[in-house]
A protein has these predicted regions:
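Contiguous, glycine/small-aliphatic-enriched amphipathic segments in soluble metabolic enzymes
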Residues: 1-159, 206-226, 230-288, 292-313
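A generic structural signal for well-ordered coil/turn residues at beta-strand boundaries
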Residues: 79, 171, 180-182
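Conserved beta-strand scaffold positions in the cores of enzyme catalytic domains, especially
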Residues: 84-87, 174, 183
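FAD-binding core/adjacent interface of flavoenzyme oxidoreductases
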Residues: 164-176
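A broad detector of the eukaryotic-type serine/threonine protein kinase catalytic domain
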Residues: 168, 188-191, 232-235
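Ligand-binding beta-strand-loop-alpha-helix segment within the catalytic cores
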Residues: 176-206
Length: 313
């Protein structure tokens, strides 16, 4: 059983959609020996998909790790140059090319599929179960196709909702972080029209509380929280929308009464809140919807290299 006090925690990595980029990202990341100085990683996925990803790496002139198929966490080597794979055996061998020179058979490489969605869902479910059983200390997830998991009959809008369901968590939110910039969201994977409808006092208050507790868990004794407005200029006293007046401000007032630190004591205009956060005014921002929080964080955290035609973190 994993001990949370060990210097190198055991990290369970869900492989992601086998027909997506998860297998290649996993192989690339675990080819870096320095990863093993910080943690003990193992992959929950399929040996066949990772084998193909290793062949892709070799074709690109990279040194591919050796795959070690395991049946339980106790079987793992946790050795640089070796990837421990808890193989769920969900991918038929004929779904993955035997050679990089042959035409890729369906459904490999053709986008969302029921087969890929079912496999990806089971990888995520398994790492959650391992964590709940304390066999691993933390989880890391690769990308899944939300369309594919729904095709497979698992009706979730993303990882966050899957984790909430299998951990019996009723109040939760997605948090993104890059360096000192942290963001939680009142809503995520819903239409913009529905996102506006979800800005309600109880939900905003829940997210403020979650943000406060998350920062404390990260070692910030008295987190300074910003709560973004929804409308341009926070609605200009109702000229451009009244959510700030009727929903967001009441949540802020209730949070302040609980002793939560919200320095501005009011919604912060969305077009300036992240600049202030980057300048150190706030430890975390409560964003009202998906893109309001995701765009600034991804602008900060990712750079597109035009010459190399790829993203760089």
């Amino acid at each position: 059983m994993a001990n949370v006090h060990v210097k190198r925690p055991i990290i369970g990595i869900s492989m992601g959609d086998p027909f997506g980029n998860g297998p290649e990202i996993t192989v690339s990341a675990l080819s870096d020996a320095s990863v093993y100085t910080r943690c003990r990683p193992l992959v929950v996925g399929d040996y066949t998909s990772l084998s193909y990803a290793c062949r892709v790496a070799e074709k690109l002139g990279r040194t591919a790790p050796v795959l070690h198929r395991i049946e339980s966490v106790e079987d793992a080597f946790f050795t640089p140059g070796t990837i421990d794979v808890l193989d769920l055996g969900l991918m038929p061998e004929d779904a993955i090319p035997n050679s990089l020179n042959e035409e890729t058979p369906k459904p490999f490489g053709v986008g969302a599929s029921k087969l890929g969605g079912e496999a990806a869902f089971q990888y995520v479910k398994t790492v959650i179960e391992l964590a709940m059983q304390r066999e691993i200390d933390a989880t890391v997830t690769n990308a899944i196709s939300k369309e594919a998991i729904n095709m497979a009959g698992h009706h979730y809008s993303g990882h966050t909702e899957i984790y909430a369901h299998y951990t019996n968590t009723s109040k939760y939110t997605m948090m993104l972080a890059h360096d000192a910039l942290r963001v939680v969201h009142v809503s995520t994977h819903v239409s913009l029209r529905e996102a506006c409808d979800r800005v309600k006092t109880p939900r905003v208050l829940d997210c403020i509380r979650i943000a406060n507790n998350a920062c404390k868990a990260l070692g910030i004794e008295t987190p300074k929280i910003a709560v973004a407005g929804l409308n341009p200029h926070c609605g200009e006293n109702g000229m451009f929308g009244d959510e700030e007046i009727n929903e967001i401000q009441p949540a802020i007032d209730l949070a302040l009464a609980e002793g939560i630190c919200i320095p501005e004591k009011a919604p912060t205009p969305p077009d300036s809140v992240f600049s202030k956060a980057l300048g150190g005014w706030f430890d975390i921002v409560v964003a009202m919807y998906h893109d309001q929080g995701h765009i600034p964080l991804k602008v900060k955290g990712f750079v597109y290299d035009r010459d190399a035609d790829r993203w760089q973190a």
